[in-house]
Amino acid sequence: VVSTFFLIMGAGYIIGGIRSCLIVGGLILFIALSEYWNRALITAYMATFAVGISAINGIIVGSLCARNEISTKIILSICDFFQTFPSFIYLIPVILLFGITDTSVMIAAIAYASVPATRYTVEGLRSVPSSLHDAGSMSGVSNLQRWISIEFPLALPHIMLGLNQTVIFALMMIVLGALIGTEDLGQIIMGSLSRPGGAGIGFTLGIFVSFICLAVDNLIRTWTDERKKLLGIN
């Protein structure tokens, strides 16, 4: 508990100084002092893995589709379509394919969280001024070199803001995954709904999940603001 807690506070200090360190540490401290710390870590581990894969998927797909106007409109329409689905619908196909396992929950979380990651990648890359595209092309760089040196660094702050949505989507799906059996906070939350007097426990654990989201949000927003200052982006 102690090592993980100080590791999180250290990340806050490195990214945003003492202010971010205290905010993140204060949010996580509430969870660390409870008896549900181990379950919270399982939730965080599952969400971290899902967010990492979703971010990679979103960056790859978004970068390919942001190249022209037609593919941009198509992928954004697809994102709109999948975001209108009730979140638990994503569990149905993975249960049919992989059965009732934690793997099914992870796959559903990755699929669900890839939507905002893709959307924000497309929007971030499309927001890069066309004059910079032209300058890169005139200097003789390839499309890949232009993406690495110009487009992606400038779009990264916007992409990182989309990571907030990716984290929220992943946590939401993982908590819902308790419907088919997981050992994280979601299992206790779902179980509290059917127990007399369990509403308080369910509400408390819901707050714990929101604290995880708020801690990640603080780290991402702090880093993004600093990055925007370095790039001179308003």
Predicted regions located by residue number:
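Transmembrane-helix boundary motif in ABC transporter permease subunits
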Residues: 8-18, 24-38, 49-79
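Generic hydrophobic transmembrane alpha-helix motif, especially the helices
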Residues: 31, 46-49, 53-60, 66, ...
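Alpha-helical membrane-interface segments at transmembrane helix boundaries
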Residues: 37-45, 49, 72-75, 79-82, ...
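Transmembrane alpha-helices
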Residues: 51, 107-111, 143-176, 200-216, ...
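Glycine-rich helix-loop "coupling/hinge" segments at transmembrane-helix boundaries
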Residues: 96, 125, 170-209, 228-234
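Short cytoplasmic-facing helical segments at TM-TM junctions of multi-pass membrane proteins
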Residues: 117-160, 189
